[in-house]
Amino acid sequence: MAVQEIKKRVEKNRGNIIQFLCEICAIPSLEGQLKEVGNRIGAEMTKLGFDEVRFDKMGNILGRIGSGKRVIVYDSHIDTVGVGDPATWGWDPFKGKVENGILYARGAVDEKGSTPGMVYGLSFAKELGLLEDTTAWYFGNMEEWCDGIAPNAFVEVDPGIRPDFVVIGEPTKMQLYRGHKGRIELKITATGRSAHAASHYLGDNAVYKMMAIITQVRELDRRMRFGMGYHPVQGYPSIAVTDVSARTASLNAVPDQFTIYLDRRITLSETRDEVIAQIKGLIPDYLQDEIHVEELYYDKPSYTGFVFPVSKFYPPWLLDDAHPLTQAGQCTIEALWGGKRALGTWDFSTNGTYWAGKAGIPSIGFGPGNEDFAHTNLEQVPLDEVVSAAEFYALFPKMLSEQVK
């Protein structure tokens, strides 16, 4: 009965759901600037009868329905990366275009595409009485520049609530995902001595010192591709140099400092301490005093001025296939569309790195679209999936209550 009623409501609101997505994609939300898009989402939640709608101290938008003992969070980050050169898009990156039932726009799949389904789905669940003994939160947050910082503040600061379960709306191709690799961001700095390039031999070129490290980083990544750190579900770890910078007096001077930045992807087969020790082990003994490894921290203020310093270590996580949350997700899919679907994991990182990785809160992922299109100038999401996702988000709380009575 609930399934059919949900489907009726979703189909009746198909146009509203699609229009809502188009409108929030058309509002740029770069660099964590969420106020305008948050206001638009908040207005929709108010219209649909959410019990509480407000911004938190960081500037994320919150919507609550119910006040039961079981607390569920639907997590959808609503900030986006930039668009690069707009001329490479062929259409307005934010207003986008709809072609063959697909919306092409920045944020369409990463990750504004899950927001309409979550917001409408929860409102339908409320109308149909499917949230008995449940408090359900929609959490539209900033994530692109520091995975997990928003949920960390959600638990520890505002609203200061530790949920029992989390559903992450990152794209999963309408399958159930339950984890991903972790990562750590590191900075390696080599110091030298400046000199005029005409007499460079009087200096000590910091770039040359780093060359051996860069070569070893590339070799380390190659060894990982051959099985080092492999995990049977999460796959292979990796490492890459992602940025460099030099400090030099001028273009005709020897640099006295050279810095590289590393992105190290981590599986559950590895530990944080092992990974850091591994990187430090790349430094030759004779350069131990001249090359230093530093773990990065994020301490930039949000658009509201809120500062929440965190390490840029993002743990890997994986929820067991037999966990009641996983089973509730699979049962929801089966009830709605017949048959369970293959479980998966993301290649990229999500807010699950805090929810599940740091806080140990059971989490799963379900969302429309394919992550392969994230951060590209072909970013896209099938509108049929955006609409159908609302069915999942509406029914899921009821199916979860049957798994964790």
What are these regions (language model features)?
Residues 111-181, 185, 401, 405:
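Acidic/histidine-rich catalytic neighborhood of metal-dependent amide-processing enzymes
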Residues 2-104, 127-132, 370:
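Acidic/His- and Gly-rich active-site-bordering loop/insert found
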